[in-house]
Structure formats: structure tokens, C-alpha cells
Regions:
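Active-site phosphate-binding strand-loop segment of PLP-dependent enzymes
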Residues: 133-195
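Conserved core segment of the aminotransferase class I/II
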Residues: 212-243
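Conserved PLP-anchoring active-site segment centered on the Schiff-base-forming lysine
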Residues: 77, 95-119
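N-terminal small-domain helix-loop-helix segment of the aminotransferase-like
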Residues: 2-89
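Aromatic/hydrophobic pocket-lining residues that form π-stacking "cages" and hydrophobic walls in ligand
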Residues: 11, 115, 174
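Short acidic capping loops at alpha-helix termini that bridge into adjacent secondary structure
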Residues: 75-80, 102-104, 149, 209-210
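Helix C-cap/helix->beta junction micro-motif
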Residues: 18, 122, 177-181
């Protein structure tokens, strides 16, 4: 079978060959420097004892989980450190589809292709739900699309690719819709530091055992190659993610 190169690769090649500045909106690589404290800590880590280079607990290094829990104001037991936010999303999506509560995944359109791919990989059925013209959540469209076959609703805020920041009350309404059809809601907040208004509200502010929040440090700290992410899960779903 002959491999067909994706068309956007050609677009990237055109951009690289252009004789002017081209804004790369493909991979999400930050163009700023990692924090100086991080560089210093990495240099110091090289001299740590051998034991510090071995497997950590499957749910992540305890000190890191504790720091994440403090920042997100959640119980440490709910935090699972992952291989980037991608794995965090995968764990959350897998858990939602593993409950025998349907196989449909509602994705807001336009959607970052990752979520479509992972839905297919997990044998889920993707359904694209249109957003408002400005990229905001269309709660009524979500309500119309949701059914007893819906296992999961995926939200990404601040959003890739539109840049929309979803209103917390709209997210809360989606969580209520999910509860009515026994679905979970996964909210990917990896771009939370990109809300330059300084008023971003996390879905963790919603008191619900339906909400899974994922995030990471790739974007905010400019360390995409380190692959450090995490998920905050409702208590009933933590054990499955840790194993």
C-alpha cells in the first residue's frame, strides 16, 4: 500500500520556502524560552542518585501531583500525571467509553483532528456538533445531539483551532446535559495560560462527578518535547486511570 502524504505537509513546505514571515499555526510550538528555574533544576537533577532515574509511581511523581493539586485546588488522589496532555485525553476518553454507556463522542466543530483520531482508535462513534459563528459553545446544538448513545462530550477551551474561550455557564449547561444522558464531559484546558484577559475559569469550578479536566506544561512552559501532562478525574474514575 502506497503512503499518501497529507496535503497540509505541502502547505508547510510552501510556508518554509516563502520569502516572508509566515505564522505557523500547525503544531502549537511556543516561541518563547522555558523558565530559567526549569533549566537550573534540570542541571541539578543530573547529579541526583541513581534511584531518582527509575520508575516513579504509575500515577506520577508525588511532589508533582501535590503541586498540581494545590494549583488546581483539588484532592491529590484525583491527579494522574501523564505522558503529555495527549495521554491525559486518551485516558479520559477511554474511561468514558469503557462504562457500557454508549459509544458516541460529541466533538465541537471545527475540531482539532486529534480528538477524531482517538475516538476512532477507541472504537467510538464521533459526532460533530456545530459551534456558534464566533466559536462559542452552542448549548442547544449539544442538547439536540446528545442521546442515550452518547458516552462522552469533549470540550477544548481555550479552543484549538478557533481560540474561543468557553463561558463557564455554557460549560455547566453542557455538564447538565451530559448528566441527563449518563455521559461524561472531558475538558482539555492545555491552553489555559493563553487567555490573556486573565479571567479564565476552569471546569473544575463545576461541582460534578461528570467532569474530567486535562492539561499540561508543554504550551505554558515551552517544553513540548518533555511530554508532561495530567488529568484530574472524578473520584469514581481515578482507579481505572492509575492502572
Amino acid at each position: 500500500m502506497e503512503y499518501e502524504e497529507p496535503k497540509f505537509f505541502h502547505v508547510m513546505q510552501y510556508g518554509a520556502a516563502a520569502d516572508r514571515d509566515v505564522i505557523d499555526m500547525v503544531s502549537g510550538n511556543p516561541d518563547w524560552e522555558p523558565p530559567g528555574a526549569l533549566r537550573e533544576a534540570l542541571a541539578a537533577y543530573a547529579d541526583f542518585p541513581t534511584a531518582e532515574f527509575q520508575y516513579p509511581p504509575s500515577e506520577g511523581i508525588p511532589a508533582l501531583r501535590e503541586a498540581i493539586a494545590a494549583r488546581r485546588n483539588v484532592d491529590e488522589d484525583r491527579v494522574v500525571v501523564t505522558n503529555g496532555t495527549g495521554e491525559a485525553n486518551y485516558l479520559g476518553m477511554a474511561r468514558a467509553l469503557d462504562r457500557d454507556a454508549g459509544d458516541e463522542v460529541l466533538l465541537m466543530d471545527p475540531v482539532y483532528p486529534y480528538y477524531l483520531g482517538k475516538t476512532t482508535l477507541l472504537d467510538g462513534t464521533p459526532t460533530l456538533v456545530p459551534t456558534e459563528r464566533d466559536g462559542d459553545l452552542d448549548v442547544e446544538a449539544v442538547r439536540e445531539a446528545a442521546s442515550t448513545e452518547t458516552a462522552l462530550i469533549v470540550l477544548n477551551t481555550p479552543n484549538n483551532p478557533t481560540g474561543a474561550v468557553y463561558d463557564l455557564e455554557a460549560v455547566r449547561a453542557v455538564v447538565e446535559i451530559a448528566a441527563s444522558v449518563d455521559a461524561l464531559v472531558l475538558v482539555d484546558e492545555v491552553y489555559d495560560h493563553f487567555d490573556f484577559s486573565g479571567t479564565f475559569e476552569s471546569a473544575l469550578a463545576i461541582d460534578s462527578d461528570r467532569v474530567i479536566v486535562t492539561s499540561g506544561f508543554s504550551k505554558s512552559m515551552a517544553i513540548t518535547g518533555f511530554r508532561v501532562g495530567y488529568t484530574v478525574l472524578p473520584e469514581p474514575h481515578v482507579r481505572a486511570a492509575k492502572t
